Curated annotation (Swiss-Prot):
It comes from Xenopus laevis. GO terms for cellular component: membrane. This is Protein ABHD13. Glycans are attached at N299. GO terms for molecular function: palmitoyl-(protein) hydrolase activity. It is a single-pass type II membrane protein.
Length: 336
């Protein structure tokens, strides 16, 4: 009994000594922390606020960037063309997401030699909302069109994300290349707004499969847009890892050497027109064009007089130079 009591007493003294030593160590560690906070408390507070804002923005970036539910019926109703040869198509991506496409067929003279435009739309609505624009392209340019609904848009499955949209674009291009009724040497990418970033990425990764690139009212990158839209906040100082979606078009455009047409509406109130000008200047294409429309707004530049004339002239140049690249280096700025 006495032995057990002695052992218990020794263990108790050892535990008390350990607790006393631990407390002393904690006080030693806390002292520099307290001194640091007293000296740099304001800096630490600002850093905590900065990290908190970055965390909130990272979490809600998808909500701020993607609007598949605007208008409210966009996931339920997809307008379809009437009286026009078309196909309503569903394909699968590499990660097994089902995408919805609409193929509009040009059936006029020499239709077997017609170029095919893959149309990447902006960050809201669905492919049906782009039909008025697409049908005018069909008639004026004598081309086939494939309109793409990204994952999470229209009748496509999944949720939108930067990497997801890139995979969607690759799946669409792969599908187009399997069609025996499409001239695979005349594939043109068209991207408006967010679709421009998707088109630039696809072109940068598939230069050997793309005949030409057409960009309309798109941006340099999401960090550039954040600095523009939230100019009162220090967004320009956020490191890239704070951005869930980056879409670094200004870096990728330098890999796009195919003939390129840049369409800029100077009345765009969402994406500053200077971004289109910078993308044009960054482009290494030997055949590049910049068409400027002073009255063009973000979504409605295609309604400006001369819009389809600029596109038609560009496509005629492609046909005369036999895609994908002209031999002579030419650049041109047209104000319409």
């Amino acid at each position: 009994m006495e032995k057990h009591w002695v052992l218990w007493s020794c263990a108790e003294r050892w535990l008390l000594a350990l607790a006393s030593w631990s407390w002393g160590l904690c006080r030693i560690c806390l002292l520099p922390l307290i001194l640091t906070f007293n000296m740099y408390g304001g800096v630490i507070l600002l850093l905590l606020i900065f990290v908190s804002i970055a965390g909130i923005l990272f979490k809600f970036q998808d909500v701020l960037l993607y609007f598949p539910d605007q208008p409210s019926s966009s996931r339920l109703y997809i307008p379809m063309p009437t009286g026009i040869p078309h196909e309503n198509i569903f394909i699968k991506t590499k990660d097994n997401i089902r995408l919805n496409l609409i193929l509009l067929r040009y059936t006029g003279d020499n239709s077997s030699f017609s170029p095919t435009i893959i149309y990447f739309h902006g960050n809201a609505g669905n492919i049906g909302h782009r039909l008025p624009n697409a049908l005018l392209m069909l008639v004026n340019l004598k081309v086939n069109l494939i309109l793409v609904d990204y994952r999470g848009y229209g009748k496509s499955d999944g949720e939108p994300s930067e990497e997801g949209l890139y995979m969607d674009s690759e799946a669409v291009l792969d599908y187009v290349m399997t069609r025996p009724d499409i001239d695979k040497t005349k594939i043109i990418l068209f991207g408006r707004s967010l679709g421009g970033a998707v088109a630039i990425h696809l072109a940068s990764e598939n230069a050997h499969r793309i005949c030409a690139l057409v960009l309309e009212n798109t941006f340099l990158s999401i960090p550039h847009m954040a600095s523009t839209l939230f100019s009162v906040l220090p967004m320009r100082y956020l490191p890239l890892w704070c951005y869930k979606n980056k879409f670094l078009s200004y870096r990728k455009i330098v890999q796009c050497r195919m003939p390129s047409l840049f369409i800029s509406g100077l009345s765009d109130q969402l994406i500053p027109p200077f971004m289109m000008k910078q993308l044009y200047e960054l482009s290494p294409s030997r055949t590049k064009r910049l068409a400027i429309f002073p009255d063009g707004t973000h979504n409605d530049t295609w309604q400006c007089q001369g819009y389809f004339t600029a596109l038609e002239q560009f496509i005629k140049e492609l046909n005369s130079n036999h895609c994908p690249e002209a031999n002579a280096k030419t650049s041109n700025v047209t104000i319409i």
